Amino acid sequence: MRLKTALWVAAYLRRCQVEGAFAVVRRRGAEEAGAVFVRISRLDGTSDLFGPAPQSALDTSRGADRAFTASFAQQPASDAAVEAKLEREMKFDSDLWIV
């Protein structure tokens, strides 16, 4: 059984805080099963973006853990490219979360 997305995001934010990183929920999606995108701003006009891994890439030995994959082949990407990608994803899936 997979954790509800809202609980997973809350735990992820707490983990970031414990590690000394600043993290916020930029967009709140579906409480139960929304996809999660993690954006890491490098504060220099570039960002890394990670999204849900395709089902074919999931490791069944890890159970129901969430898996992520880089959204751009060349990381970091420009902030404009990351924003454009997120806008396209939001049009496709209105239930997604952005952290």
PLM-predicted stretches and their roles:
Residues 22-55:
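Short, well-structured hydrophobic secondary-structure segments
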Residues 53, 60-99:
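Helix-rich interaction surfaces within compact, conserved domain-sized segments
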Residues 1-35:
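Long, hydrophobic N-terminal alpha-helical segment
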Residues 11-18, 43, 52-55, 88-91:
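Short, intrinsically disordered, mixed-charge
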